[in-house]
Amino acid sequence: VLFYLAKLGLSLLILWLIFRSVDLGEVLRELAQIPVYIVLLVLAITMMRQYLQYRNWRYALKLNPWFCADEKQISRSYLIGIPLRFLLPGGHGSFAKVFFIDNSSKTASIAAVASEKLAQTWAILLFAAGSAFWVFPGWSPALKLMAFIVIALLPLILGGFTKWHRDLTVLRDGYRRNIPRMLIIQVIAVLLTMLQYYLLLNTMSAISFGETTLRMSIVQFSDTIPITISGLGLRESFAMHFLETAGYAGGKAITATLALFFIQDVLTCIPGLALLIIRKKD
């Protein structure tokens, strides 16, 4: 509880510092002026992303050749995992969803949730590393290229542990078969997020999809820094910095990130919270 309150306090502190330099009224007005059809489009894309993430969770569980839970249990554990993300920084609270699904071993369950998190983090880092070539022109090209190559090869490197660790050898074939699928799905998921930002940002000022992807890939990198609730506050400060030179004042940048946070993170928690409440009553 104290740990959760600490990260909640940090998120609120960062937001307070941000709103000291930004007109909160402007942000609220911008949020209210987002067209309904844009909100519905962003919500529809969120549903597509959630389906893709569900597929990834299913692939992750099936790394284990002896996994045999039914689809209902897989979907229930996935939905419950969405609100659990808020319990720990970096979304690591979602690891607790392994307690809501049957598996042949604890090792297989841990490997499933770890491989899912690996795919999610890998895609975010890959996009951020690729964007760095344009967003940070002053950085060493060799250093940026090295970082990009290491990140790109990271799943292959980690796959080597399935050969050397005795408890993971049974997962080797599943890793080779499913990890490529999971990585492709996560790349698509990141592109869908960029599309959502593109739609939201263009309600305030014109920006191309390519420019959106370059800048918001760096902003999304903040989600991997495990110090706040689902990146809240940290993401807004990144957005203010990296969108300013694209013509977005602080209030407009925050409008886009807060709108997507509410649609993509808060609204999607509702089914999982309902399942948790029902389970607690039972």
Language-model segments: residues:
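Generic hydrophobic/packing signal
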Residues: N64, L87-G91, F99-D102, L126
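Membrane-interface segments at transmembrane-helix boundaries
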Residues: N64-S75, A96-L118
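Short intracellular "coupling" helices and adjacent cytoplasmic loop segments at the cytosolic face
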Residues: L79-A96, I229
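Predominantly cytoplasmic-facing regulatory/coupling regions of multi-pass membrane proteins
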Residues: V1-L79, S131-I227, L234, F242, ...
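Membrane-embedded alpha-helical segments of transport systems
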Residues: I80-L88, A108-A132, L258-P271
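N-terminal low-complexity, intrinsically disordered patches enriched in charged
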Residues: G90, D102, M240-F242, K281
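Transmembrane helix boundary and interhelical loop/hinge segments in multi-pass membrane proteins
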Residues: G91-K97, L234-A239
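Conserved short cytoplasmic inter-helical helices of the MFS fold
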Residues: G91, S105-A108, K252
